[in-house]
């Protein structure tokens, strides 16, 4: 018997919804990254996208432990000299709810074409509403 290798056409992608209210950022991000890669499935194959679609609601209510609310800093650069800007977690959540979670998950996924395809299956919304009810996502508790 040879090792099973999944083909892209035979992979079934399911939809899950996660309520991030009062959940810790890193714990949610690590579970989401695992499910986006498909490592929770028996048919996991490293070179095939076997992961599921994840919808996260209430991302604006995510928490971080300790003093990371002010200490965790996100950097970005405009490309111009002296164009680096820093934003802490509290300000990032206030201005762009969910972007901190997207950055955390993206850092946990592989870099390259397969990782870029995986991050596209993550849908993050700051509020309780999402436009993916037609896909009938199952509730996932973390």
From Swiss-Prot:
InterPro entries: Ribosomal_uL13 (IPR005822), Ribosomal_uL13_bac-type (IPR005823), Ribosomal_uL13_sf (IPR036899). One of its GO terms (cellular component) is cytosolic large ribosomal subunit. Keywords: Ribonucleoprotein, Ribosomal protein. It comes from the Bacteria. One of its GO terms (biological process) is negative regulation of translation. GO terms for molecular function: mRNA binding; structural constituent of ribosome. Part of the 50S ribosomal subunit. Belongs to the universal ribosomal protein uL13 family. NCBIfam families: rplM_bact. This protein is one of the early assembly proteins of the 50S ribosomal subunit, although it is not seen to bind rRNA by itself. It is important during the early stages of 50S assembly. This is Large ribosomal subunit protein uL13.
